[in-house]
Amino acid sequence: MDIAMAEKNTADIGFEKQIWNAACVLRGNLDASEYKSVVLGLIFLKYISDRFNDKYRELLAEGDGFEEDIDEYTSEGIFFVPVGARWSEIAAKAHTPEIGTVIDDAMRAIEKENKRLKDILPKNFARPELDKRRLGDVVDLFTNIQMIEHGSEKDILGRTYEYCLSMFAEQEGKRGGEFFTPSCVVRTLVEVLKPFKGRVYDPCCGSGGMFVQSAKFVENHSGNISNISIYGQDSNPTTWKMAQMNLAIRGIEPDLGTYAADTFLDDRHPTLRADYIMANPPFNLSDWGADKLKEDVRWQYGMPPAGNANFAWLQHMIYHLAPTGRIGMVLANGSLSSQSGGEGEIRKNIINADLVECIVAMPTQLFYTTQIPVSLWFINKQKKQPGKTLFIDARKMGTMVSRKLRELTDDDIKKISDTYEAFVDGTLEDVKGFCAVADTEEIEKQDYILAPGRYVGIEEQEDDGEPFEEKMDRLTSELSEMFAKSHELEDEIRRKLGAIGYEI
């Protein structure tokens, strides 16, 4: 999900890059959004084929003749791959002119046998723009993958899928990166919320990153992935399909609705009350259908402005919370202080309802797609510290991993989640410039503005032990030397200009 991915195994990262480089060769004259489905579709096809083959060999060895019995596979969550669609048959035709049609037919056959995949898999490999010789080379590369060398097959293909998603997001930039939330941002939300069991919901789920990280969290803490149930929605049909494939690779069975749909105008989970809601909605979405939703039951704290959906997203999520539910979401910083279109009043009402548990101001340059500064909002219907809100200023955190991109390190994420834990436990002490706890009265005095900088203050400078008088004597002496040096340089420049006939 991230270029320098969470839980990366340095021995394996070259493999992901190898796949990506092959994908770049495939691109030819396709644009990124088109070849995205080609590459991700191939990864998915290889994944389900390999899972099927493992089980097929196991059944063959048992010798009871059940290797073509679809129930033997579906009962273990394995997709059934019919004759004609198996990777060995695709590999055998890798360098024939009809390889694109062979893959398209395989995708159709797999969809037909597996209802969960209906209308989800890409079937555009036969198109003339796709170089069939290069496509055959990529099929060869996938055929020759030695999974044993690369650790768990599910993990390596899942990570490859995520790696390619991140690279597509970087390439597409503002035009197409909305489907992707950087891993370090998702992991921060997950590490604070700790979704061990219950219903997890993302109303704008993109490619499913929140769900993948939630499942990883459960697995990393020796939990059972079946203890969480996944609900999501996305309005973009291509992205919705990518999420379905991404989650299937991870062995996660989500309910993403029966089709891609607009969350505000066509809520696919109207009765859902979730235990954990995690989301990175589109920032400052302007045309969100406000005129059709004026009396909507979700706007408990005020009608969101037609020109900005930020508080529509927040209220939609609050509406879908279970009585003990919690939210972790990304919002543009404008939402911390905006007074326009009634946003100030909505924010005031949400604060006075004692729902805002924590605000984290995030560093810049975390996203491929925008330079808009963002914060994380954590909402809790049953706060352990009633009447209090934690403010964390994390703007100085993170490490630049490229000229344009910053990431939070594991230590950064741990520091944020540990600070939150200490606040919940009642053991947190304010740290100037980093974290502070404020009660509702203090927030009211600040006109209900939630910018952490207003509450955490300025970081204390370390005392270097040098007495003030001595420091001033030293600094003024150094300054005097610099002035003298500057006069010498000025005289030298005047002399040199005079020598060539230019007097100053």
Label for each model-derived stretch:
Residues R273-A274, R298, N308-N310, T324-R326, ...:
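Active-site lining segments that contact anionic ligands and/or coordinate catalytic metals
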Residues P128, H150, C204, G232-N236, ...:
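Hydrophobic alpha-helical scaffolding
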Residues E219, A248, I252, P282, ...:
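Hydrophobic alpha-helix feature that most strongly marks membrane-spanning transmembrane helices
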Residues M1-F196, D255-R268, A361-T364, P386-S402, ...:
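Non-catalytic, mostly N-terminal accessory regions of nucleic-acid modification and defense proteins
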Residues R175-A279, N284-W288, L293-Q300, A312, ...:
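Conserved S-adenosyl-L-methionine
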Residues Q18, V25, E34-Y47, W240, ...:
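Conserved Class I SAM-dependent methyltransferase catalytic core
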Residues L355-V356, L366-D418:
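C-terminal, active-site-flanking charged/polar segments
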Residues N29, W288-N308, G334-E343, P363-T369, ...:
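Short, contiguous acidic/charged loop-to-helix segments that flank catalytic cores in large enzymes
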